[in-house]
């Protein structure tokens, strides 16, 4: 019998595409949902029974009572943030009950220290006008600590606390040399970590072994990507990116799975484009359309609360992300946000000096200077948020979806028409 493969949900733009909602829908049929990269800089909103839950570090499947959730070795964990997230969501509704017995944390995952968050903010201030737009959650400094091999891992916290203390002091010393004004209450921090050690101990395990065991047992494993392709450290709009691998390759390094274990790759695409923070954004609209999308789409960051920049759907971005990730099906979200527009533009090419560019420019300067070629699609100017059948959509909305399929070469399987779990249309295969 062929071994079960994992399915993965990835963002194909600059994040905030609606990955959490698709994961939540798919988690109903999954046995396991796992995170493999990023930290609590991610923000996924899931609406269950009209209750809106915000997840940052917890996998979005945590709201399903029969679903195990895994935080893999590629994730960086801020333990105070984890427990704060649990408390906030538990106060909203009952869907996280029993979460401790279902959450598995990698012993190889790195710890985000409070000082990492302070350093993140200090580094951002140092940049002056060249700010990256970081969430200041300490993600970059934690991955930096990991790369220069003085990071603290969960297994360190599970071991001899005296050794953990020594390593912690070394990290403090390193950063205080770089940032003399950095203040760290060492005693308070160590006391807090002693408490967290006992809290998380029952959840900590070798998640690489665990995920392979799940697959051997033919469990249905769903992987939840954080951030998105255009925020990937290698393939995104560097340096305005995150510090981890948000693409399909991050699965192998962030969970310990071989490439042949990856089955379907579901790419999530917003029906228009948004990004938080600075960096190139060729289809950004600074006028009426951008303001409309921001207001109608409630485009504010889940993690930061910052206004998202808005613009037209960019198929150069989508096609680039589909190519890198081997996307097998697309989930097109927030189609209902376009309801009131008379004409809808889709970017189909970048040009420089009149010449069409074949790929995605690596240079931010080039990307900032490209001329964007659009196709115009007729709007439908009617409310589609209550529609649940593809054939019941206005013909113009159907045409928009089919155009995305045509331009990407990838079938659209789902359409999101609202924030609720039920506000999803299954798209029939193209005849």
From Swiss-Prot:
Q: Which Gene3D superfamilies match?
A: Adenylosuccinate Synthetase, subunit A, domain 1 (3.40.440.10), Adenylosuccinate Synthetase, subunit A, domain 2 (1.10.300.10), Adenylosuccinate Synthetase, subunit A, domain 3 (3.90.170.10)
Which residues of this UniProt protein bind IMP?
16-19, 41-44, 135, 149, 227, 242, 306
User: Which positions does UniProt annotate for Mg(2+) binding?
Assistant: 16, 43
GO MF annotation, one: adenylosuccinate synthase activity
Q: In which pathway does it act?
A: Purine metabolism; AMP biosynthesis via de novo pathway; AMP from IMP: step 1/2
Name the positions where substrate binds. 302-308
Which SMART domains is this protein grouped with? Adenylsucc_synt
Principal location? cytoplasm
In the record, biological process GO terms are:
'de novo' AMP biosynthetic process; IMP metabolic process
Binding site residues for GTP: 15-21, 43-45, 308, 334-336, 416-418
Q: Which UniProt keywords apply?
A: Cytoplasm, GTP-binding, Ligase, Magnesium, Metal-binding, Nucleotide-binding, Purine biosynthesis
Keyword Cytoplasm recorded: yes
Q: Which domain of life is it from?
A: Eukaryota
| Needed co-factor(s) | Mg(2+)
- SUPFAM superfamilies associated with the record: P-loop containing nucleoside triphosphate hydrolases
Q: Which reaction does it catalyse?
A: IMP + L-aspartate + GTP = N(6)-(1,2-dicarboxyethyl)-AMP + GDP + phosphate + 2 H(+)
A Pfam family per the record:
Adenylsucc_synt
Class of enzymatic activity (EC top level): ligase
HAMAP family recorded for this chain?
A: Adenylosucc_synth
Subunit structure comment from the entry: Homodimer.
Q: Can you tell me which family this protein belongs to?
A: Belongs to the adenylosuccinate synthetase family.
State the name under which the record lists this protein: Adenylosuccinate synthetase
